[in-house]
Structure formats: structure tokens, C-alpha cells
Regions:
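Outer-membrane beta-barrel channel domains
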Residues: 85, 92-93, 97-99, 106, ...
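Predominantly the C-terminal beta-signal and adjacent terminal strand-loop region
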Residues: 594-640
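Extracellular/periplasmic loop regions
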Residues: 427-542, 569, 617
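Signature for the C-terminal beta-barrel architecture of outer-membrane proteins
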Residues: 281-283, 292-478, 540, 547-550, ...
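N-terminal periplasmic/intermembrane-space "pro-region" immediately following the signal or transit peptide
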Residues: 2-226, 456, 460, 472
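Flexible, solvent-exposed coil segments and beta strand-coil junctions
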Residues: 186-196, 246-252, 286-293, 326-335, ...
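Short loop/turn motifs that connect adjacent beta-strands in outer-membrane beta-barrel proteins
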Residues: 132-166, 177-181, 217-230, 275-285, ...
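Membrane-embedded beta-strand positions of outer-membrane beta-barrel proteins
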Residues: 166-172, 230-234, 287-289, 323-325, ...
Length: 640
């Protein structure tokens, strides 16, 4: 019997076996006609989605049939909800989440590992998950980085918030070049009878890098920054150089014209920890200690390197502002692979910068920065036997360089006009400049501006770069601008002949590879000291970028190059009236991403320098002129 009396009312029972007549008859029954209620079985029968077979999850029937009590409520003793366990998309690995509770009712099923909740197998378009398409719910395996993968931070390795990332990368660079190459007439020459100071300009340089990076981090994988990160990345390099003049691979002419080297190191390693949350909008402050990459401005005009440092960084005002404070204790670089060793460099660099997004115009970012370079006095020969500190010119005595850079840079767009700019002023002191033969005070400046417009698939670019030169080598003020370790992505970047090639002049380099500055530094910029007695440069660029397809881009550039002043060069080579014209740099490059991502990148370029009067005066033969110089390269990056 019922425990209490109720008024007669219609019981809203669910349909049984989708029979409408059954539903009508049940709705007409009055509760007062029953003295008791018999409990009925509660079967669970999954049925297919009849309206869309094979698409979407199955439609489940109600697991209860006519088992309401007379108050219209479910019974207390319900059968547990049963369901199909579908595998998650991608490669998930084994879950490390140990269940802490079991199912106790049909209303709630514990799913403690929220990352591995499966979905029905679904071939959305009936095309068997093509490899190059963005296809949902694709099955994965451990060797496929394009679907969700435990090794690519898509699923936690430990618990709910600790992830592992494995990166395996290969980079292969082949570089053919023609640059002025001095002969060795007093020792020996590979070609008897050579009379000119500069001989065969041809050379081939090959670099192969293998990187294996392991990263463990703790976080939520959305907008929230990581709580902590640990990363280590060993790198192996092999390199090969072939030239046609002696004294290039080594000062010892007996070393020949070919050189093959290898080097292995722990290139990147650091520990990162979040110190504080600065706002409810995921603003944070973190610290990172160890060997880490860092570029100090938008285009790498002053500093771009990977070395040992302690960095304090974070965001403010809903990520509208960003800041960095970083102190580098530089390690020595391997001469031929440019990788870090574990030997101290004797150079300390401090950098502070602050970014403000949407400055004046939406999409326009401004940056203020400060750099300080303390390069201590030392005597250093590189692994090929070349003197790199101090410069092997003039008074080659160890000296200390202290330089402070003050900079302001912008990057972004103003309406449809893309704009990048930078201005820097450097001041400091060199205790004994080898060329000036005396201590000098540093006072130099530089500026850069790039404007571009992209109405469609073509981007039109115009840019200019200026670095002041020194017009009096005999005073005690050095006004030639030099960077710390630059790698500018500007005016053609790595596709440009002038920027990509290293051009020697007597015992130094007129300019270093991956640099715009003719700074007369020794050997390479990683091991030598900054030199502020240099001719400076004026560069004007016109370029066009063509987005041929979603996968392929064509980059073309034309650079007009001039020394700012040639007074330093005239004293350096004991030659009067050197013109300022360096020449015209023409380049054409292609960049392809066949898989529409960074797992496979191919770059190739061809470039040439049409020498101007100033270049002819420095490198011209006894009779005739310097021929046009050409270079070509290929660069293949593969990553997992």
C-alpha cells in the first residue's frame, strides 16, 4: 500500500520500446487504482543512430522501464549505468591516474583521467584519415607526431598535469660561396705563379646538426603558464670545409685546403619555475636558469644567442605587457660548429627589456631595452689556430671592453601598413683598442626601418639600415657601431649575400657571417670582442615576397650597400681615397613547408654581389677588377 494518500493524477512514464499506443495507455492510468507496484527489470540496450548510421555516437534507450514508484520518482535501487569504452584519438600511452572512487549510482560515472576520455570512432568524410589533411579523431601511434601523441605533450605522462615533450631534429646546411680569399705567396701556394694578393674565391662549407631534446613540464596546457619546466638538449655536429687556397682552414699551410671536424655538447639545458601569479588573467612571473636561447629585440640587431644565463620574465595587464631581465655568463663556442662548450668565455652580458602591445595603434608593439656587455681581457686562439682575442692587428694586447646600449624598437602594423623600426645608442670604454693603439671612449648609434604592404599574395618591402662609422682613428672616441652577438632578420636575412657570408680583410673579417656590420672583428663574432673602430654602413633595401602556395614562399631582395666612412679602412690597409660604395646585393630564395608545419622546412637561395668602387679598391687585383661574386645554399630541417 502507499505510505500516504495523494490526489489522482497522470503519471508521466517514459515510452516502452518506442510504442506510442503503450505510452497513451500508461498515461491514462490513475495511481489510485493500484494497491501496490511491481518492480520491473531495467534492461540497457544500445541502438544505432538510425537517422545518421555510422555518424556520431549511438543513441541509448532509457535504461528504466516502468520502474517509477507511485510518487513519480526513480527507485532507490538502480542498476549501474553501462557504456561502451571507446579509445581516445591519437597515441595516449598508459594512464598513471589511479582511480580513487568507484561507480555507485547510474547518475554518475567517475572519469578521473580527464585527458583520456574516448570518443566513438568516426571517419568524418569516409576517406580513411588522409595524412596531409586536418582530420578529426584520427587514430595515432607513437611514431606519428601529427596526431595527438603522449610524446608531444598532448596527454600527461604523470598524473593530470605533468607532460613530456620529445623533439628529434636534423638540420643539414650546404653552402657554396665565392668570397675574396688571400693567397700565401711567402709560404706555398696550390697554384704556382700566382701574383695577386687574392686568389681562387671558391669554397664549400657543409654543416650537419642532430638534436635530441627532452622536456618535462607541469601545467594545464591552455592559457595558464607552466608551473615548472625542465629541458635538456644534446647536439651532435659534423662540418666540412673545402677551399682552393692555403692558410684558410688553418694558419699552417701544411694543413691543406680541406678540413673535417665534429663536435658534441649539451647545448640547451635549463630549469624554469613560476614564482608568482600577478593577476587573475594568467599574468605571471617566472625564473629560468641554465643554457637557454634569447633574442633581445624583434629582429636580433644587438643580441641573439643560446648560452648560460639566469632569466626573470613575465607578463602584466592581461599579457599586454611583457618584461625580461637576463644575465648571461657566456660559455666559449666551438670554432667550427658554433655550439657551446663548457669553458668560460670571460664575458658577462646583462639585458633588460619591456614590451607594450597595442601602443597607440592596435597591433603595434613598442619595446624599450638596455644591454650591458662586459668583455674581459683575455688571450685566445681558436681550434684552427687563429688568434681571436685580441684582434691580430695593430697592438694585439689583451684589453677589456665595456659597452652599454640604450634602445627603442617597434614592430607591428598601423592599419594596413606593416612597420618595424629600431634605434640604438651605445656608450662605454675600451681599455686599449688594437687599431687606435690607445684607450678609447665609445659613442655610436644605429637605426633601422622597414615598411611593407601586403594587398594580396605579394608583400612589397622597403627598408633602410644605418650604423655610424668612425672618421678619425687617431682620436680617443670610437664612433663605429658594433653589436654584441647579432643575427638580424632584416633586408633579406639569411638569403642575402652580404649578410650570410664572412668576408676576410687582412687578419680580421671585414664583416662576419649573419651580420650586417662591417666591424673588422677577428675570426668569428662569438669568440672575438666588439670593435667600435669600424667604417659603419648605410643599406637601402627593396624586396618582394611571393606566397606562391600555402606551402611555398619566394623571397627576393635588392640591397644597395655603402660604407658610412672609409677613414678607418684607409688607415687599416694604408691606402688613400677608398670610395664608400660596397656594391649591389641581389638575392632570390625559396622557403617550403610541404606539410604546412615546422616539421619539414626546406630553404634554398642564390645570391650575388656586384662589387662597387669601394669593394674594388679593397680587393681588386693588380690588373682588372673583382669579378661578380655568387653564393648558393640549401637548408633542410626535419623534426619530430
Amino acid at each position: 500500500m502507499l505510505p500516504f494518500q495523494i490526489e489522482s493524477w497522470t503519471v508521466p512514464l517514459p515510452p516502452v520500446h518506442n510504442d506510442p499506443t503503450r505510452l497513451e495507455s500508461l498515461n491514462d492510468i490513475r495511481l489510485c487504482e493500484f494497491d501496490f507496484l511491481e518492480e520491473l527489470p531495467a534492461p540497457f540496450e544500445p541502438v544505432e543512430n538510425q537517422s545518421h548510421p555510422g555518424r556520431g555516437p549511438p543513441i541509448l534507450k532509457d535504461s528504466f522501464e516502468n520502474i517509477y514508484d507511485l510518487s513519480g520518482e526513480r527507485p532507490i535501487a538502480e542498476p549501474l549505468f553501462r557504456y561502451f569504452a571507446y579509445p581516445p584519438a591519437g597515441f595516449t600511452g598508459s594512464s598513471s591516474v589511479v582511480p580513487s572512487e568507484s561507480q555507485e549510482s547510474a547518475h554518475f560515472v567517475p572519469m578521473e583521467d580527464r585527458w583520456r576520455i574516448g570518443v566513438p570512432i568516426w571517419d568524418r568524410y569516409g576517406r580513411d584519415h588522409p595524412r596531409l589533411d586536418d582530420y578529426p579523431q584520427a587514430p595515432g601511434n607513437i611514431f606519428n607526431p601529427y596526431t595527438q601523441n603522449l610524446l608531444k605533450e598532448d596527454f600527461p605522462l604523470i598524473g593530470q598535469n605533468t607532460f613530456f615533450n620529445l623533439n628529434v631534429a636534423s638540420r643539414t646546411i650546404a653552402n657554396f660561396r665565392q668570397v675574396p680569399t688571400p693567397t700565401t705567396p711567402f709560404e706555398s701556394t696550390p697554384t704556382p705563379g700566382e701574383e695577386d694578393f687574392f686568389g681562387n674565391p671558391n669554397g664549400f662549407f657543409f654543416l650537419q646538426y642532430y638534436t635530441l631534446a627532452f622536456e618535462l613540464n607541469h601545467g594545464d596546457k591552455t592559457f595558464k603558464p607552466n608551473d615548472w619546466r625542465i629541458k635538456v638538449a644534446p647536439v651532435i655536429n659534423t662540418n666540412y670545409l673545402e677551399v682552393y687556397e692555403l692558410g684558410v682552414v688553418s694558419p699552417d699551410v701544411a694543413a691543406g685546403t680541406r678540413r673535417s671536424r665534429g663536435f658534441a655538447t649539451l647545448e640547451e639545458w635549463f630549469l624554469e619555475a613560476k614564482l608568482a601569479d600577478l593577476s587573475p588573467d594568467y599574468d605571471f612571473m617566472s625564473v629560468r636558469a641554465g643554457s637557454q636561447p634569447f633574442t633581445s629585440d624583434f629582429r636580433g640587431f644587438i643580441f641573439s644567442d643560446l648560452n648560460r644565463a639566469v632569466r626573470l620574465f613575465g607578463t602584466r595587464l592581461s599579457n599586454r605587457d611583457q618584461f625580461n631581465l637576463i644575465l648571461f655568463d657566456q660559455r666559449e663556442k666551438d670554432t667550427n660548429s658554433f655550439l657551446n662548450s663548457f669553458d668560460p668565455r670571460g664575458q658577462t652580458i646583462f639585458i633588460a627589456n619591456y614590451f607594450r602591445q597595442d601602443f597607440i595603434w592596435p597591433g603595434h608593439t613598442v619595446q624599450a631595452s638596455f644591454h650591458f656587455d662586459n668583455d674581459q681581457a683575455s688571450l685566445k686562439y681558436d681550434k684552427n689556430g687563429n688568434l681571436v682575442r685580441p684582434d691580430p692587428v695593430g697592438l694585439a694586447t689583451p684589453h677589456e671592453v665595456n659597452a652599454a646600449y640604450f634602445g627603442l624598437a617597434t614592430d607591428g602594423h598601423i592599419n594596413e601598413l606593416n612597420i618595424t623600426s629600431a634605434m640604438y645608442y651605445v656608450t662605454g670604454h675600451d681599455t686599449l683598442n688594437p687599431q687606435a693603439l690607445q684607450p678609447v671612449n665609445i659613442s655610436a648609434y644605429s637605426g633601422a626601418l622597414e615598411l611593407s604592404y601586403s594587398p594580396d599574395w605579394i608583400r612589397y618591402r622597403a627598408s633602410a639600415f644605418y650604423a655610424s662609422g668612425d672618421n678619425n682613428i687617431n682620436d680617443n672616441i670610437a664612433t663605429g657601431f658594433d653589436a654584441i652577438i647579432d643575427n638580424p632578420q632584416f633586408a633579406g636575412g639569411e638569403f642575402s649575400f652580404w649578410q650570410r657570408q664572412s668576408i676576410k680583410l687582412l687578419g680580421t673579417n671585414l664583416k662576419n657571417f649573419n651580420s650586417l656590420l662591417p666591424d673588422l672583428r677577428a675570426s668569428n663574432k662569438f669568440q672575438s670582442q666588439a670593435n667600435f673602430l669600424n667604417p659603419g654602413i648605410r643599406l637601402f633595401n627593396l624586396g618582394m615576397d611571393f606566397e606562391l602556395t600555402q606551402r611555398t614562399r619566394l623571397i627576393s631582395n635588392c640591397n644597395f650597400l655603402y660604407f658610412d666612412t672609409t677613414a678607418v679602412l684607409q688607415s687599416f690597409v694604408f691606402q688613400d681615397n677608398i670610395p664608400t660604395s660596397i656594391g649591389t646585393d641581389l638575392s632570390l630564395g625559396v622557403e617550403s613547408r610541404p606539410l604546412l608545419n615546422n616539421n619539414w622546412i626546406f630553404r634554398a637561395g642564390i645570391s650575388g654581389l656586384l662589387p662597387g668602387d669601394g669593394f674594388q679598391a679593397l680587393y681588386g687585383p693588380i690588373t682588372g677588377q673583382v669579378p661578380n661574386l655568387f653564393a648558393a645554399f640549401t637548408d633542410l630541417e626535419l623534426a619530430f
